[in-house]
Amino acid sequence: MSQAWMIASGKGGVGKSTLAAALAVGLAMRGQRVAIVDADIGLRSLDVMLGLENHIVYDLVDVIRGTCKLKQALVHHWRYPTLSLLPAAQMCDSSQVTDLDMQRIIFRLKKDYAYVLVDCPAGIGRGFQNVLGAADDTILVTTPDDVAMRDVERVCGLVTEYGLPRPMLIVNQAVGEMVRSGDMYAPQVIAQTLDLQLLGVVPKSEQVYRRLLKQMTAIEGKGDVQAALNRIVRRLIGEQIPIPMIEKDSRAAFTRLFRRDKKGSEWL
C-alpha cells in the first residue's frame, strides 16, 4: 500500500529539505518507487540538492493550472531510475495552490509510487496547511535547541488536531560530546518530552555540506551520517532497527522550557 509522508519542521535551517532529499534517495537505492514533491512554492531547492536543476521543464503549479500533465512535470533521476521529483514553482507563491490541489496530486502519485515524500515549507503557514489533508503520516525534523523544539511542538499540535497520527521525529545535527557533557539535549529526552516516536538521530557533520556542494545527497557515501540515514530509511520500510542512544539524561534542563500544571506539560 502506498504511503504519503509530509516532512515538516517548525523553524527553517534545521536540515529538513536536506533530509527529505536523502531519504528519497535512500528509498530509491533500495529499489523502491519514490516520488518527492517540493511543496515550498517560490523557494524550490530539491532540484539543486538532487542535481536535477537543468532538467526541469514544468512544475507543480503548471500541473495545477493544466499547463501540463503530471507525468510531464515529473523529473526522473538520472542515477536512481525509481526516483522522481515534482519541483515547486519558482516564480509563484503558496496562494497559487490549495489543499484540494495537493490532495489530488498526492492521490495520483500514490497510484504509481510506493512512497510519496512531500517536503513542506518551514513553519505553519499556508504551504504547510495545504499538505495536511494529503498526507498519511508526518515526519518532523528538529535540531536539539530550544527554539527549534518549541516550534516543532506547535507543528505537532496542528498535525494531531487535524486528525493525523502522532508524528515521527528526526533529531538532526546532534553532537554526541555535547549531549554527554550536558550542554545539548539528548535526542531520546526530546522525543519523550514531546511524546513522539523517535525515528532517528543524525549527527552534525561537515560531510553533509561538502556533499551538497558536489550536488550529492547526505546519504550517499560512507560515514556516521550515512549510517544514521540508512538506519532511518530501513525503519521507514518496516525493519526493526534499534536507535543508538547517547547516554546523558538532560531531562532536568527542560525545566526552563516547560512548566507543569494540572493539565500537563505546556510550553512557556
What are these regions (language model features)?
Residues 4, 85, 198-201:
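Conserved beta-strand scaffold positions in the cores of enzyme catalytic domains, especially
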Residues 16, 20, 98, 102, ...:
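Short, conserved glycine- and acidic-residue-centered signature motifs
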Residues 100, 104, 108-111, 115-210:
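Conserved catalytic-core segment of NTP-binding enzymes
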